């Protein structure tokens, strides 16, 4: 019963964050007696019913699923999900006119504190190594896993991120230049922060050395041109090249006219690949057997929820402590002030630090889009474009290396990242200059499908999509 109550709350929770209030059905409907043309509950009513379902589930669930029950819902996950939903309830997405001083933040804080403290009491803790989250099943940080086991159930992750030459498919999930810039330097500060130990100046200078002195998570998450990539079955010292004419066509990115070769995936990839979660012990022929568990929720996310709510209700010491723990585990230098490069001078600065750290720590885990919606920051993307990085081999004097010489050196893995110059290219390369983000206010809540409204005329459409239903808490 506890499992089913949680699943009902979870299913409704996922609908609420996309659409606002939905018809929240709490009893089995009888097609002969009940009116099946139900109306939408208000968003406030849905949150109340969802939290009641979670509280009832928590009272019935074991503290922590162990042994043969590992992978089943337990109190740790239910409490953490409750905190996550109350964070949404308090968020700007649902409270556009009173974003950070509404009464719901205290409720979110209490739930987040309870979830964090309970997880810690059950032995959940940050892993020593960041990469263990993806490559060590049953690690200490997992709050709830999605379990995979070859051959019964495998994950397609490896096929979506690897270069085509080492996979059985073409990568369709690649980083952008903005994601590269988001990672701090080794001292925790931005590359363009003049107070930083590793300050490099402006973006043009940084582009030519973007892989140097970075947050260690950068190496764990981003596979860049000429980086070592010891995939099983490759030669000793193998480097993954992306430069046109040097890398195989399916792996290359760019439009260098001096090469005499063209890249075939310019409209799909970005000159970089995702390294996060890549199991290099799998050779190309075994890539489809990838079966590491996926950490659907891990302690770091719970800590971010706790930090965000704590900051908004005045417990800024708690928020900063959560961020420091995460950066310490990442391997960032503490600095003389022990702040790991964080800018945490006040409520607004801490708020931004939390969102920035979420972007890095949780990258490629499916959170960023929802974070931008939840905080009503999506429209900050308007007018921006996506960029990838083309690598072009150069000589010591900076002149462009002949393709014959570049190929000869690359065949022996003698070309390192320093032996290239880097140029930003629009993603996709075929895009026109006007291909920029244009986010509408209406995107913070999605519409109900027209087909569903035709099936049930009592379903109101959202007021930002031509209807009358208010999906917010206001």
Predicted regions and their residues:
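Acidic, glycine-rich segments characteristic of secretory precursors and extracytoplasmic regions
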Residues: 1, 44, 108, 206-217, ...
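Secondary-structure transition into beta-strands, especially the periplasmic turns and strand N-termini
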Residues: 1, 5, 106-114, 310-320, ...
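Aromatic-anchored glycine-rich loop motif in surface-exposed flexible loops
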Residues: 1-75, 84-103, 267, 271-297, ...
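Beta-sheet entry/capping signal
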Residues: 3, 23, 141-143, 217, ...
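Short, well-ordered loop/turn and helix-capping segments at boundaries between secondary-structure elements
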Residues: 21, 117-121, 149, 224-227, ...
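Long, intrinsically disordered, low-complexity segments
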Residues: 49, 131-192, 289, 293-296, ...
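An aromatic- and glycine-enriched ligand-binding surface/loop that stacks and positions planar moieties
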Residues: 55, 72-79, 84-255, 380-407
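C-terminal low-complexity, acidic/polar tails when present
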Residues: 219-302
């Amino acid at each position: 019963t506890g499992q089913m109550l949680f699943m009902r709350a979870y299913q409704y929770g996922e609908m609420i964050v996309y659409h606002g209030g939905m018809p929240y059905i709490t009893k089995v409907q009888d097609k002969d007696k009940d009116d099946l043309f139900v109306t939408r509950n208000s968003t406030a009513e849905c949150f109340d019913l969802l939290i009641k379902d979670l509280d009832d589930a928590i009272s019935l669930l074991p503290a922590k699923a162990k042994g043969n029950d590992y992978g089943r819902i337990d109190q740790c996950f239910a409490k953490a999900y409750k905190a996550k939903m109350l964070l949404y309830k308090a968020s700007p997405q649902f409270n556009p006119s009173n974003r950070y001083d509404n009464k719901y933040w205290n409720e979110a804080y209490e739930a987040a504190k309870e979830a964090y403290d309970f997880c810690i009491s059950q032995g959940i803790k940050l892993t020593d190594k960041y990469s263990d989250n993806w490559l060590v099943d049953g690690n200490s940080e997992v709050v709830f896993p999605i379990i995979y086991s070859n051959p019964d159930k495998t994950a397609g992750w490896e096929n979506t991120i690897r270069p085509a030459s080492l996979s059985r498919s073409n990568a369709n999930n690649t980083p952008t230049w903005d994601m590269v810039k988001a990672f701090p330097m080794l001292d925790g500060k931005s590359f363009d922060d003049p107070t930083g130990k590793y300050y490099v100046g402006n973006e043009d200078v940084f582009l030519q050395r973007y892989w140097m002195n970075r947050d260690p998570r950068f190496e764990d998450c981003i596979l860049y041109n000429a980086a070592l990539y010891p995939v099983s079955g490759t030669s000793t010292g193998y480097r993954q090249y992306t430069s046109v004419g040097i890398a195989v066509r399916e792996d290359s990115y760019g439009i260098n006219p001096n090469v005499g070769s063209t890249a075939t995936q310019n409209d799909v990839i970005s000159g970089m690949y995702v390294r996060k979660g890549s199991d290099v012990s799998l050779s190309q022929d075994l890539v489809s057997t990838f079966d590491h568990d996926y950490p659907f929720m891990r302690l770091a996310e719970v800590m971010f929820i706790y930090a965000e709510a704590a900051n908004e209700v005045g417990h800024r010491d708690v928020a900063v402590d959560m961020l420091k723990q995460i950066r310490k585990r990442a391997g960032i230098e503490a600095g003389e002030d022990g702040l790991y490069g964080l800018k945490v001078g006040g409520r607004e600065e801490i708020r931004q630090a939390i969102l920035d750290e979420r972007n890095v720590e949780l990258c490629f885990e499916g959170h960023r889009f929802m974070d931008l919606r939840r905080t009503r920051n999506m429209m900050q993307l308007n007018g921006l474009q996506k960029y990838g990085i083309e690598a072009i081999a150069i000589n010591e004097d900076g002149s462009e290396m002949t393709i014959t010489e570049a190929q000869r050196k690359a065949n022996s893995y003698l070309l390192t990242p320093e032996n290239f110059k880097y140029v930003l290219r629009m993603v996709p390369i075929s895009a026109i200059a006007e291909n920029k983000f244009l986010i509408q206010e209406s995107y913070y809540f999605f519409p109900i499908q027209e087909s569903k409204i035709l099936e049930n005329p009592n379903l109101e459409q959202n007021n930002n999509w031509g209807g009358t239903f208010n999906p917010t808490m206001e």
